[in-house]
Amino acid sequence: MKQLSLLALLGIAVSSAAVAHHSRAAFKLDKTVQFVGTLTEVTWANPHLFFKAMVDNDKGGQDEWSFEGGNISSAVRGGWQKEDVRAGDHVVIEGYANLNPKIKYALLERVTLTATGASYPRRDMTREVKVEPSKDFSGTWVLTGRDNRTGEHFSAPKDLTQLTALGKAQIDAFDTVNDPYFRCIMISTPRVIFGAAGYRFTRDAKTLRIDKEQSNRHRVIHMDGAPMPANFKPDMDGWSVGRVEKDGTLIIETSGFEPTPWGVARGVDSSAQKRSIERYKLDPDGLGISASYTITDPVYLTAPYTVVGRYKKVADYEFPAEPPCDPEVASRHLRNGK
């Protein structure tokens, strides 16, 4: 373990991966390092918490480090409140150092206050609570199989080849730094169904409501087949109508989209002609969902484009009220936390 201070001799090797919105390919995820010092900045904002600290080095001096935390909802589930950790606190931070030793920008896993011993993980890793199965898709779900250590989730999709000349030109010009999310332009439907954080499905007689954690996003699916109103204003979520087939598959059809940056896929925009069909099939045990979406858009696609994924059921929890996305924070990782 790299020695950054005297307390680094007590460093703990950790095999768990850090998974959040941005790629973790820049960090050494095979073990944690301990950083000891005084916080100079605590930014409680979305999509990520950020910290700066003057960290003790092995030469008897200090270096300024930046640390990227998780999102607010994960921190709250881990036991944090905004006022718990402040600038001026002396702390021990467990985190993943940068692969480039010259870059003083690390991924925070846990921060401990030396004055009180209070410890705050980036996310709650220890809760063991009973998970109740779902009978009708209701409940709280998270995406499975998402591991952004390699950065593959943040590249242009390799399987997207059915592109018009306009779509191909956009893919050829792809650069991840142009991701609209880094400017707080949210991920549109249906791409958003395979994003990070949790989803809560709530059923009533006429609608299915899908709440998206972290983004304050609330979709309403009209299960009664209600037609799109004449005065409906197109947006990134569109107008959705749903039904449950005889085999139990939930079908959601959506139109009424506005033109959206990267609305088809990473690197490919969408037009007002975009249409989508989502399919959800509940596992027999009620603890998993097989999901997919198919997009058509004649402006950018020559044929339908389908993406598949999986959800797992988790114990229900409250989605905390969160501040809106901060563009300065959303792009801060591009500047190594500066």
Residue ranges and their predicted role:
Residues 5-16:
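Bacterial N-terminal signal peptides
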Residues 17-25:
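Boundary at the C-terminal end of the N-terminal hydrophobic targeting segment
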Residues 25-338:
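PEST-like low-complexity, intrinsically disordered acidic/proline/serine-rich tracts
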Residues 11-12, 20, 73, 78:
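Preference for short coil/turn "hinge" residues that link or interrupt alpha-helices
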